[in-house]
């Protein structure tokens, strides 16, 4: 049996194919090098940008596999022609990369450090004017952002990130006015359409509370997706119109929900930012990382530390119990989280026995209200109703998965109305866009509802408008959605379906992300063992960015 065959339990055919192809092309005979290549490809599927050859055996938790000795393994790789010129693989300490991801990580590091060290200069406005008593954390964050080119603004839900951003923009506009310059060109962006819409709404609400002179300086702000900001190209999905040779024209760029931004997307953003631009990256590093490879926000927080990170710690939004639950999950205190769940109350419900009937009592009335608004053709009411409740699942398939619960809710709707839903399109169908469509200006993560109109069924999708259903191909039903897809959005009430405790997706970050999607009420469906498993298991992504960012010797 070959070494790759011995690892068949953890490798996919694609991992093996790439490893075999590369080693043959490089005339590399060492089986341990071939295994390392396969593991590097496998790592990308799991969200890592590299594989840590000293710790991978412990992370896989299959000690009986014939793991190579780490020192001999690293020595074999260092001598491999695959690390020659041009390199196919790269080593960074114990970390093995495919060349592309090594280059992207180094580029992100270089660009971040250049922006952090940039000192824009100019008169500094009176920060305390907009950040008075009770805003000490936000005031400190604004001072950091006014003093350098890049700021990472972190905090959980309700800690005042949006307030800080809006008032920081007012201060930057004031700074420009003091220097006799026009108001800065400002871009607001987020990874998804839903997150961008939330960002624009929240920032505008804060700006509307400022004095008239500030409001005039900040007119016309419009949030967009990162893809739209960078300018999609029809010939490629990984490169954009704006890049190092054609930079973005903005003086200030704010990116929200940065935890969702992959390493590759961050590289594309940073190479398009002018050296004199202020870049503010906003997010919650305790949430799920991007679907694609990387853990950029968490790496920036750990790697930059006090050099570029401003953390907001005090939450002002949640009902006390939701905040307490989120805090217990974030800090890994399973006993405290279970105590909050057991106490229940107005904002918390814990369903830890057969949930089917209880879920029916929740999801069917919501689906019926959505259907009623859609039948009446009330687009605004339909979209508002859509955001009243979310049913969130960890998995797509299986008894606790999105596919199962979408079918179940549709069956219940058919029973309730006496009209079985035979077709894929129906009035009242909640939909989720699953891929970017640059022609229609629809983006992955946009949500909407199918409504009745005099011209037949139309899909109303956020701020993008209405569309004939026949024009939409990359959409799916959204009576339930995955927790990953819910990032960047919120609902008044959220129901979280935890998978079985042995699910590899069940992690602290997943649970925390799900709970913090709720504005006013969260319902957790799962046994005590599943709650404990979620809180005690942290997602591990292998990256080298935080190490690269740290000062030498730290």
Swiss-Prot record:
GO BP terms in the entry: double-strand break repair via homologous recombination
Enzyme class: isomerase
Enzyme Commission number(s) from the entry: 5.6.2.3
Keyword Hydrolase: yes
Disruption of the gene: reported phenotype: Unlike E.coli, triple recB-recC-recD deletion is no more sensitive to DNA damaging agents (UV light sensitivity, mitomycin C, methyl methanesulphonate or ionizing radiation) than wild-type; has reduced resistance to H(2)O(2) which is exacerbated by further adnA-adnB deletion. Triple mutants have no effect on homologous recombination or on NHEJ of blunt-end, 5'- or 3'-overhang DSBs or on incompatible 3'-chromosomal overhangs. However the triple mutant disrupts all single-strand annealing repair of DSB.
GO cellular component: exodeoxyribonuclease V complex
Residues where ATP binds: 155-162
Annotated InterPro entries: Coronavir_polyprotein_1ab, P-loop_NTPase, RecD, RecD_N, RecD_N_sf, UvrD-like_helicase_C
Keyword vocabulary terms for this entry: ATP-binding, DNA damage, DNA repair, DNA-binding, Exonuclease, Helicase, Hydrolase, Isomerase, Nuclease, Nucleotide-binding
GO molecular function, one term: DNA binding
Quaternary structure and interacting proteins, as annotated: Heterotrimer of RecB, RecC and RecD. All subunits contribute to DNA-binding.
Function in brief: A helicase/nuclease that prepares dsDNA breaks (DSB) for recombinational DNA repair. Binds to DSBs and unwinds DNA via a highly rapid and processive ATP-dependent bidirectional helicase activity. Holoenzyme degrades any linearized DNA that is unable to undergo homologous recombination. In the holoenzyme this subunit has ssDNA-dependent ATPase and 5'-3' helicase activity. When added to pre-assembled RecBC greatly stimulates nuclease activity and augments holoenzyme processivity.
Note from the entry: In the RecBCD complex, RecB has a slow 3'-5' helicase, an exonuclease activity and loads RecA onto ssDNA, RecD has a fast 5'-3' helicase activity, while RecC stimulates the ATPase and processivity of the RecB helicase and contributes to recognition of the Chi site.
Family in the record: Belongs to the RecD family.
Name assigned to this protein: RecBCD enzyme subunit RecD
Organism: Mycolicibacterium smegmatis (strain ATCC 700084 / mc(2)155) (Mycobacterium smegmatis)
């Amino acid at each position: 049996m070959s070494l790759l065959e011995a690892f068949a339990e953890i490798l996919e055919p694609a991992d093996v194919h790439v490893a075999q192809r590369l080693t043959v092309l490089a005339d590399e005979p060492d089986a341990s090098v071939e295994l390392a290549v396969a593991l590097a490809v496998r790592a990308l599927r799991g969200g890592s940008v590299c594989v840590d050859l000293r710790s991978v055996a412990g992370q896989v938790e299959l000690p009986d596999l014939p793991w190579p000795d780490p020192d001999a393994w690293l020595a074999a790789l260092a001598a491999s022609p695959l690390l020659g010129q041009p390199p196919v693989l790269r080593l960074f300490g114990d970390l093995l990369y495919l060349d592309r991801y090594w280059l992207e990580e180094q580029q992100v590091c270089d660009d971040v450090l250049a922006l952090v060290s940039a000192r824009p200069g100019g008169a500094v406005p009176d920060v305390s004017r907009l950040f008075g008593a009770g805003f000490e954390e936000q005031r400190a964050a604004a001072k950091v952002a006014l003093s350098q080119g890049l700021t990472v603004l972190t905090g959980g839900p309700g800690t005042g990130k949006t307030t800080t951003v809006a008032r920081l923009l007012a201060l930057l506009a004031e700074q420009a006015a003091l220097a006799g310059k026009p108001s800065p060109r400002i871009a607001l962006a987020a990874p998804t359409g839903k997150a961008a819409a939330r960002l624009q709404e929240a920032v505008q609400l804060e700006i509307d509370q400022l004095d008239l002179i500030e409001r005039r300086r900040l007119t016309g702000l419009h949030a967009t997706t990162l893809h739209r900001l960078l300018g999609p190209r029809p010939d490629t999905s990984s490169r954009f119109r704006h890049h190092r040779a054609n930079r973005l024209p903005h003086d200030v760029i704010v990116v929200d929900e940065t935890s969702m931004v992959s390493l590759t997307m961050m590289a594309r953003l940073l190479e398009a930012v002018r050296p004199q631009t202020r870049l503010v990256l906003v997010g919650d590093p305790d949430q799920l990382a991007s679907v694609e490879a990387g853990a950029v926000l968490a790496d920036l927080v750990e790697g930059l530390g006090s050099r570029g990170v401003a953390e907001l710690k005090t939450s002002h939004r949640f009902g006390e119990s939701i905040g307490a639950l989120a805090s217990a999950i974030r800090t890994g205190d399973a006993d405290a989280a279970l105590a909050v769940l057991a106490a229940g109350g107005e904002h918390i419900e814990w369903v830890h026995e057969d949930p089917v009937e209880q879920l029916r009592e929740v999801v069917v009335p919501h689906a019926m209200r959505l259907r009623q608004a859609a039948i009446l053709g009330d687009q605004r009411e339909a979209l508002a109703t859509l955001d009243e409740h979310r049913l969130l699942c960890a998995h797509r398939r299986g008894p606790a998965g999105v596919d199962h619960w979408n079918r179940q809710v549709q069956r219940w709707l058919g029973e309730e109305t006496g009209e079985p839903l035979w077709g894929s399109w129906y009035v009242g169908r909640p939909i989720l866009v699953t891929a970017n469509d640059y022609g229609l200006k629809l983006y992955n993560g946009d949500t909407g509802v199918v409504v009745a109109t005099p011209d037949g069924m139309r899909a109303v999708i956020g701020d993008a408008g209405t569309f004939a259903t026949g024009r939409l191909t990359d959409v799916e039903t959204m009576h339930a959605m995955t927790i990953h897809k819910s990032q960047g959005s919120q609902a008044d009430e959220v129901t979280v379906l935890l998978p079985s405790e042995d699910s590899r997706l069940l992690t602290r970050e997943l649970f925390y992300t799900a709970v913090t999607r709720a504005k006013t009420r969260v319902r957790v469906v799962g046994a005590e063992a599943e709650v404990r498993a979620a809180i005690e298991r942290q997602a591990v992504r292998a990256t080298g960015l935080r190490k690269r960012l740290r000062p030498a010797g730290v």
